[in-house]
């Protein structure tokens, strides 16, 4: 299971939200590009989210994303970018900046045809984010909850050359209380795509538990890493167990 650090961008800074709430923000680094360069020393892939873009529905932090991609990709690192990608033009712009993968969440619910089209044109470079609140997929920067489930999204994309599904339990994101192992296991067993797990990781034991779930190919970590619950080296070892 691949360990993938997250950099969430807000106002040009690296931050984390608590349970997806924009009124509960912790700033971890005022220079996201420098942070990305440090992470590249140990990690092959980075997960970057334009939080303002996720709310606005279009890229907002493009300059900060560009700097992060340049810093992390300077020595061959791969960056996946999400937040506000709801059009082909937005997707293409990030790929042109050097993103290895693009992450689409709201578009997967509201415009699955767009996701299928992009996956077909860029096979293996589209990640679909399914961010769940009480079992339903949240959209528009997690501020609205749709009527569909994570498995509904997966079924709508069956057969598309999607790289992975990124599953987040929003109620656990930024809490370090532990990931939703049951929901992650059920999705991985049923969706037909590799699953990236996210939300709630707070210990090495959480990473080891996720690593034992068949079909989970990666895990996104943020707050626990930046607040010292474990070192990057320890996390990579636990994820590989």
Curated annotation (Swiss-Prot):
Catalytic activity, reaction form:
1-(5-phospho-beta-D-ribosyl)-5-[(5-phospho-beta-D-ribosylamino)methylideneamino]imidazole-4-carboxamide = 5-[(5-phospho-1-deoxy-D-ribulos-1-ylimino)methylamino]-1-(5-phospho-beta-D-ribosyl)imidazole-4-carboxamide
Which GO terms fall under biological process for this protein? L-histidine biosynthetic process; L-tryptophan biosynthetic process
- Enzyme Commission identifier(s): 5.3.1.16
Asked if the keyword ATP-binding belongs to this entry, the reply reads: no
- GO MF annotation list: 1-(5-phosphoribosyl)-5-[(5-phosphoribosylamino)methylideneamino]imidazole-4-carboxamide isomerase activity
Domain of life of the organism in this record? Bacteria
Listed under GO cellular component are: cytoplasm
What metabolic or biological pathway is this protein involved in?
A: Amino-acid biosynthesis; L-histidine biosynthesis; L-histidine from 5-phospho-alpha-D-ribose 1-diphosphate: step 4/9
Predominant location: cytoplasm
Which Pfam family is an annotated match for this chain, by its short name? His_biosynth
Q: Where in the cell is it found?
A: Cytoplasm
The record lists its disulfide bonds as: none
The UniProt keyword set, sorted, is: Amino-acid biosynthesis, Cytoplasm, Histidine biosynthesis, Isomerase
Residues in a coiled coil are none
The UniProt entry, under HAMAP family, shows:
HisA
What is the protein's name according to its record? 1-(5-phosphoribosyl)-5-[(5-phosphoribosylamino)methylideneamino] imidazole-4-carboxamide isomerase
Q: Which organism is it from?
A: Sorangium cellulosum (strain So ce56) (Polyangium cellulosum (strain So ce56))
Q: What is the lineage of its organism?
A: Bacteria, Pseudomonadati, Myxococcota, Polyangia, Polyangiales
């Amino acid at each position: 299971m691949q360990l993938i650090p997250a950099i969430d961008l807000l106002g040009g800074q690296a931050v984390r939200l608590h349970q997806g709430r924009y009124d509960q923000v912790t700033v971890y680094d005022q220079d996201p590009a420098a942070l990305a360069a440090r992470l590249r020393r140990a990690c092959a892939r980075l997960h970057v989210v334009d939080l303002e873009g996720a709310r606005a529905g279009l890229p907002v932090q493009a300059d900060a994303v560009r700097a992060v991609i340049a810093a992390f990709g300077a020595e061959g690192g791969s960056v996946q970018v999400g937040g506000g990608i709801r059009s082909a033009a937005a997707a293409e712009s990030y790929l042109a900046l050097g993103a290895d993968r693009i992450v689409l969440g709201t578009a997967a619910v509201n415009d699955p045809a767009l996701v299928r089209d992009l996956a077909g044109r860029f096979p293996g470079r589209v990640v679909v984010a399914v961010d769940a609140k009480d079992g339903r997929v949240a959209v528009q920067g997690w501020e609205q909850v749709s009527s569909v489930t994570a498995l509904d999204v997966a079924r709508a994309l069956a057969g598309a050359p999607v790289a992975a599904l990124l599953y987040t339990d929003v109620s656990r994101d930024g809490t370090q209380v532990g990931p939703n192992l049951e929901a992650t296991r059920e999705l991985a067993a049923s969706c037909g795509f590799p699953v990236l797990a996210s939300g709630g990781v707070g210990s090495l034991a959480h990473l080891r538990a996720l690593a034992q779930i068949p079909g989970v190919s990666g895990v996104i970590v943020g707050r626990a890493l930046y607040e010292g619950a474990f070192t990057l080296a320890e996390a990579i070892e636990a994820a590989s167990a």
